[in-house]
Amino acid sequence: ILDDGYYLPMDKYLFVYHDQLEYIGQLNPNIIDQAYAALNEEQIEEYNELTTQNGKVNYLLAYDAKVFRKGGVSQHTVYTITPEIASDVNEFVFDIEITLPQEKSGVIATSAHWLHKQGHKASFESRSFLFKAIFNITKLLHIKRSKTILFTSDSRPNLSGNFKYVYDELLRQKVDFDYDIKTVFKANITDRRKWRDKFRLPYLLGKADYIFVDDFHPLIYTVRFRPSQEIIQVWHAVGAFKTVGFSRTGKKGGPFIDSLNHRSYTKAYVSSETDIPFYAEAFGIREENVVPTGVPRTDVLFDEAYATQIKQEMEDELPIIKGKKVILFAPTFRGNGHGTAHYPFFKIDFERLARYCEKHNAVVLFKMHPFVKNRLNISREHRQYFIDVSDHREVNDILFVTDLLISDYSSLIYEYAVFKKPMIFYAFDLEDYITTRDFYEPYESFVPGKIVQSFDALMDALDTEDYEVEKVVPFLDKHFKYQDGRSSERLVKDLFRR
C-alpha cells in the first residue's frame, strides 16, 4: 500500500463493505439533490451543457472535493480527494491525487536530458529518411509490375486472421504460380522491428503490386505509392460497430481531418452493403472502393465438417465443458488503448455466478481482450465452474462450443450471430462509453440481444432465460450479405479478376 513513502498512492478507490458478501459503497441521491439546489444561475447553465448523467453528477460532486495543503497554504505540496462516478466502471469512487514540488535538475542533468532528446530526434529522423529512401529507390526500379504480393501487419506476429484465409485462397486459385508472396510482421505496434525487416519492409512496399494490411499500419501512410499499386485493407473486425479512424475526428484519440492515416487504401473489403458508408468514412476513401465480398475469416463458421472436428478438439482440450451448458464471457477492454487496457473484474459477482453454474449444469469460459493487463484470478473452489481461455487458440473455435455469449461492445457478436444462439450485453458503463468511443448505429436498437446494465439484471436474464434471441436472425441477415463460406474466394476473384 506504500508508494514512495505515501500511505495512499494516487488512484481511484472504491469503498467496499465486507460481510458474507462484498457490497460496494453507493452514492446517496440526497447529496446530489442538495448540491444541485445550491447552484447559482451561471453554474446551472454550465451543468445543463453537460451531455451525460455521470458528467452532471461529477460536476456537483466536485464541489465536495477536499484539498489538503502542506502548512495549510502550500501551492506545491497538495493532497486532493475528489468524489466522483468513475466512467470506466460506473461506480462511486474517491479519486486521490498528490501534487509534489518538482525537483530542480542540475546543469549536468539538464544538459544530459537535452542531449538525450536531441539524440532521439536525430535517430528518428535518420531512420525515417532511410526508410523513405529505400522505398523511393525501389519504387523507381519497379515502375512495371514486379509480380509480388505482400502481407504486412504491425499488430500480428504471423500469417493469421483474414490474412491466413486470403493466403490459402491465393494458393487454391494458383495465384502463387504468377506472384511471389512475401510477409513482414510485427507482434505489436509498440514493439521494435527486427533489424532485417527495417530494410525489407520499405523495399517490399516499394516493390509489391498488391499490399495487404488488416489494421492501423503507421509506416504505409508516410509514403506515396505508384498508381498501379493496390493497397488492400482486410480489417480485422467484422462489421461496423465501434467508431474508428476518421469517424472519431473530434473525439479523444481521433485523427485530425487532414491526417494521411488510412487514406492510402485502394480497396477495403467488408461484410455487407450496410458497412460501406461507415468504412468509407472511417478510412477517408471513396465508397466505390469499399467492396462487400464478405470477411475471409468468417468462412470457417459455415464449414460443417470443420464444426464437427473442432467441437471434438475443444472437448478434448477443455474436458470441463463436456455435457455442460457453455457460457462465453468475452467483453472488450476498458482504458485508453494498449498501455492502460484493463477489465474491472469486481463488476462480476463470482460467487453468485458459480451458484448459477451449479444449479444449471453450466460452465463459464472467460476470454479477455488481448490488451487486458490484469489477469483473472479464479479461486480454487470456483475452478469447476470457470476457466480462463484468454490464452487459448482463435476465439472463433471457442464459438463452436458456446451456447450463450455474454459481451458488451466487442465485434465478436457478428461472428457469434452466425450460430443463431442467444447473447446478453452487460453494458454497465454504456452512457460514458457512447460519449468517449461511440457507435455507428444506436446501441440499444442495434445489438442482437438483451442489454443489462447491472450484475443483478444480468443474473435475472440468465435465470429467466430472457435473451431477446429473436433479434439475432435479422441482425445476421443485415450484416452478412453472404452466408456461404466463400468470402475469401470472392475477394481473390474480385482483386485478381479470376
Predicted regions and their residues:
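Catalytic binding pocket for nucleotide-activated donors in carbohydrate/polymer assembly enzymes
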Residues: 379-382, 411-479
